[in-house]
Regions:
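Exposed beta-sheet edge/beta-hairpin loop segments within beta-rich domains
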Residues: 186-192
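Amphipathic alpha-helical hairpins
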Residues: 186, 222-223
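HotDog/MaoC-like acyl-thioester-processing domains
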Residues: 215-222
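Soluble ligand-binding/transfer domains with enclosed cavities or grooves
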Residues: 2-185, 196, 208, 212-215
């Protein structure tokens, strides 16, 4: 079965580095778990007035509030079919500050939107379109687009003025034999909100059951 990222990228998926093709190329039918472990060279957040915004998101694992250097990091990717039968991939990120902080997401591919839809947090309140391209070096570039807030079956587009725009680049360093990741999240009013960069290695194992804690508490059908 084709992965959601193969559907999103189409023929350009073949331009990715082979290690990225492996990491983003499995589906629920493959029964594979991918767990990345590494270190973020730097995790940062914006000016002090952004912290209440970050703290609000952190309550539902949508954002993180910690900062520092050489922060241990894990990312857990499991492919499964959700309660609506949609091919879904988890992105469960843990940053090990003095205490663990989580930034979690589940992703699907929406043919209607011609994009990956990234459901952020524990209750899928926030749905974000992700637009992906492969760069000339075989890296994966991701930029967030339209955002929608959903609660009690009602979906509302988030005004661009208050949206957080994420830019992500993931690549593979053949010299280090590791993945590189850099994420920057900004707001057009408040400026940079937070970001991180670092490296990690990925291990692949047979998946018998998706851990309950990486699945959202609540699923939403609205893409």
């Amino acid at each position: 079965m084709t992965s959601i990222f193969q559907r999103a990228l189409g023929p350009d998926f073949g331009q990715l580095h082979p290690q990225l093709q492996r990491r983003f190329g499995f589906s629920a039918a493959d029964g594979v778990a991918c767990v990345g472990r590494g270190t973020m060279d730097r995790v940062w957040h914006g000016r002090i007035f952004t912290r209440p915004f970050l703290a609000l998101g952190a309550r539902r694992h949508i954002l993180i509030t910690g900062s520092g250097r050489d922060i241990p990091f894990t990312i857990e990717n499991y492919a499964y079919r959700d309660g609506f039968g949609r091919e879904t991939v988890t992105f469960a990120r843990t940053f090990w500050f003095d205490t663990a902080q989580h930034w979690d997401a589940t992703m699907i591919y929406s043919a209607e939107r011609s994009a990956i839809v990234d459901y952020l947090g524990t209750h899928q309140h926030l749905a974000v379109d992700l637009h992906m391209t492969a760069d000339e070096q075989g890296g994966l570039l991701i930029r967030s687009g339209e955002q929608r807030f959903s609660e009690c079956g009602i979906g509302l587009a988030v005004p661009r003025l208050i949206t957080a725009v994420a830019e992500v680049r993931e690549s593979y360093d053949d010299d280090l034999d590791q993945f590189r990741i850099e994420v920057v999240v900004t707001n057009r009013v408040f400026g940079p909100l937070f970001g991180y960069r670092g490296t990690f290695t990925a291990t692949y194992s047979e998946l018998t059951q998706v851990p309950a804690w990486v699945r959202p508490v609540k699923e939403t059908a609205r893409a």
